[in-house]
């Protein structure tokens, strides 16, 4: 990270667009990647257009790092806003080479002119474009075209990068090829990003913060893990509910092929290729892969058993209970979810505040980092 991160991104957009009503207000840190997530047609792209100045709603407000882009007296037009915009499909100039497309939006004086600017060579390296510079867009694959579009947006030296479902037009294999490039940008650049998607797997891999939308409304905005573990929100009650946790690689056991990860509230063992100690890793733990025990189990095939406290609970239908766990002695660590039957809940006589043990049957690493699952055997 080379620059001091902007303080916040705030938006307030309300109004009717034909038969669609938008009621979106949010404030998120202007650092890292903020996912804008919800089902198709909920208003995600409309919010992005409002941030970009492509859609003007009376009474709207928008400021980034204290700079007002829209209020009662101000409305900056799109070309006046320091943004980069990446659309669902790359809009490249067909008569220009990849190099010329990349440099098209760069400020005069060269892409490296401004202090703290993202340099041309850096963008080429981050996005793996060096072998494509002399090609025409018609000779690129869909994934290559989108990487060029991202590079062009970065070289415009934006203060905020807006990405409107940039992978939605690509097949799953191509998506999996591009996601590591986006993660590399996230790790190396301080540029804040608003990333629109209706694909939760993209959000789980990329986002630090989340704006959750449904039917034109912002349901909540905040850190990804907080929204994932809030039983009042649909992410936590979904059948495939999971929580993402950022961890640090601590050691590697080459005999058993197991990586020890340190997270807030304990340590986990995960099958993995060798990695260097100190490397950051994002893991995903599904609610269905966590079971509960009153006492520490002995002689079990489950590798990961951590002390935890029940933070809160919520019924899920007539026969299940969603349990929000806080890891570590005293429950001061990371949050996880567990989904148990009401019979198990009653038999264990559980209640909020109880201390117990979380048996974690499955831990998934992000795919590009050597995806693996730690099974119960």
Curated annotation (Swiss-Prot):
GO CC annotation terms, alphabetical: plasma membrane
Binding site for ATP: 38-45
Annotated compartments: Cell inner membrane
Classification via PANTHER family: ABC TRANSPORTER I FAMILY MEMBER 10 (PTHR43514), MOLYBDENUM IMPORT ATP-BINDING PROTEIN MODC 2 (PTHR43514:SF10)
Function: Part of the ABC transporter complex ModABC involved in molybdenum import. Responsible for energy coupling to the transport system.
Record text on subunit structure and interactions: The complex is composed of two ATP-binding proteins (ModC), two transmembrane proteins (ModB) and a solute-binding protein (ModA).
Name used for this protein in its record: Molybdenum import ATP-binding protein ModC
Organism: Rhodopseudomonas palustris (strain HaA2)
Lineage: Bacteria, Pseudomonadati, Pseudomonadota, Alphaproteobacteria, Hyphomicrobiales
